């Protein structure tokens, strides 16, 4: 088997996206209301606005029930906002699309397909030639460390391995933005740390724009370039924080004084910070 480099096959082939002045993601005055069984109106999100530039790893952090996942699902086009607009690459989101990749907290692999076939699924549906599909699948199998398990089915994989496949499958489709809804939330603490390290490494290679949802402050700082701190009922952005810690990163940074300071600041934002805006 030939050696595998950290260079994406698309970059080698010259398909790298040109830098764009417009934000990769723009959320503009988005609100989301639900009708309760009693007939009352519940406001899940209230006039949320923010932007994520190209190649940024952005994190939504907040308590349960603050609308983090709801906002991600709106961005994915799986739900519609009550008001406001969301744009990806300058195009308004009006439903699901190949320009957005999604990794869920739950395990979403097709159980009748192997690891290789799961990663290949979207490429095959788009009619990509077999040779090109093979190159891309091989690259991502190596990126997530699952080449030896390429012909296994999901029932033969651990939870962490299944989430590795989900990440590879999403990235293989080369979306404009990767949406991640607490993808490590169901994993044990040790596996979660391993997955965070893997995601850091994969992101350094792909530089894909990411919107990542978590309630874990450590995870938000470890992974993110920018953190949007949310408050609940209704869901709003309380604070926007840039992470002043250089990349590449590793788990040793949790002892860095800047990391500890940010963790303390975000903790106070979540519990007794300023009013939402």
Q: Where on the chain are the PLM-derived regions?
A:
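Hydrophobic anchor residue at the start of the ABC signature
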Residues: 167
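Helix-to-loop junction immediately C-terminal to a conserved catalytic motif
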Residues: 76
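Short coil-to-helix segment of the ABC ATPase nucleotide-binding domain corresponding to the Q-loop/switch region
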Residues: 113-121
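Conserved signature/switch motifs of ABC ATPase nucleotide-binding domains
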Residues: 152-155, 173
């Amino acid at each position: 088997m030939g050696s595998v480099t950290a260079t994406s096959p698309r970059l080698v082939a010259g398909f790298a996206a040109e830098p764009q002045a417009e934000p990769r993601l723009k959320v503009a005055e988005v609100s989301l209301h639900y009708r309760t069984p009693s007939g009352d109106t519940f406001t899940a999100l209230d006039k949320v606005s923010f932007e994520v530039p190209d190649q940024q790893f952005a994190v939504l952090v907040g308590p349960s029930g603050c609308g983090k996942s709801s906002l991600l699902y709106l961005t994915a086009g799986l739900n519609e906002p009550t008001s406001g607009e969301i744009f990806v690459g300058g195009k308004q989101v009006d439903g699901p699309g190949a320009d957005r990749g999604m990794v869920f907290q739950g395990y979403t692999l097709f159980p009748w397909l192997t690891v290789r076939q799961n990663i290949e699924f979207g490429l095959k549906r788009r009619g990509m030639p077999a040779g090109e599909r093979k190159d891309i699948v091989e690259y991502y199998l190596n990126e997530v460390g699952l080449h030896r398990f390429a012909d296994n089915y999901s029932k033969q994989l651990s939870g962490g391995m299944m989430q590795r496949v989900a990440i590879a499958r999403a990235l293989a489709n080369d979306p404009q933005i990767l949406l991640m809804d607490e993808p490590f939330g169901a994993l044990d603490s040790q596996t979660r740390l391993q997955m965070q390290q893997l995601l850091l490494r994969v992101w350094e290679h792909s530089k894909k724009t990411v919107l990542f949802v978590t309630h874990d402050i450590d995870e938000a700082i470890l992974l993110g370039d920018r953190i949007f701190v949310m408050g609940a009922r209704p869901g709003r952005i309380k604070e926007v924080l840039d992470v002043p810690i250089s990349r590449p990163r590793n788990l040793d940074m949790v002892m860095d004084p800047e990391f500890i300071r940010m963790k303390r600041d975000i903790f106070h934002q979540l519990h007794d910070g300023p009013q939402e805006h």
